């Protein structure tokens, strides 16, 4: 089945009354999924075609939030999804100041419900190492980092600039696959890395978000655990055959960052 046939099949299953798709355009950039801009009777949607279909019992809660694109349909048994197209610019092409970033993060977290599901960073890292055939090799890193969660609340956990769109009505957040309760400072750090902030700007964003001082140790260990998560995800993807150049680069860059932080 080619891409066009796959998109048609998903649209037909999720929106049964659709008779004809007028246009299908592939959207580059997805590492885990394939995304398509689809036009149906002058309306524009995004169809997410997942490469690894699996049940997603909690994701619908997050993708239904007003801070996400409007949800049209989601198959929670496999993850295929249709949302309404949003006009705007990804944060890959525009930037927020550290203070603007802190306000975005605060609004984001205030909108995300807690107690839906848990995103345990340590468990995720261990799972990725296991999937890559490197069972237990994360432990020396974890022992050196000694990261401790400060508080737990609903988080996004993947705030790279490709997942945030600046629109005329404010910021909208995409890709809620990994949402769940976690330390919100993990989200802050992930956002700051994506924004390419300087060391001082990391502090400014984190302290503006928290409304209090942040110790060098807290910032450093959270940066390190975030980078180890990025490395762990990359080695798992590569082990599964996803040899995208960007993933290989992430594997090498993130573990080098961990070394530098330690």
Task: For each feature predicted by the language model, list its residue ranges.
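Conserved N-terminal boundary motif of the eukaryotic protein kinase catalytic domain
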Residues: 18-26
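A glycine-centered beta->alpha junction motif in the catalytic cores
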Residues: 52, 79-94, 110-113, 127-128, ...
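Activation segment
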Residues: 52, 88, 171, 179-181, ...
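A conserved alpha-helical element in kinase catalytic cores
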Residues: 33, 43-108
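A short beta-turn/loop motif at secondary-structure boundaries
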Residues: 26-30, 74-76, 222-223
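An alpha-helical support segment within catalytic cores of ATP-dependent transferases
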Residues: 3-18, 111-157, 161-162, 167, ...
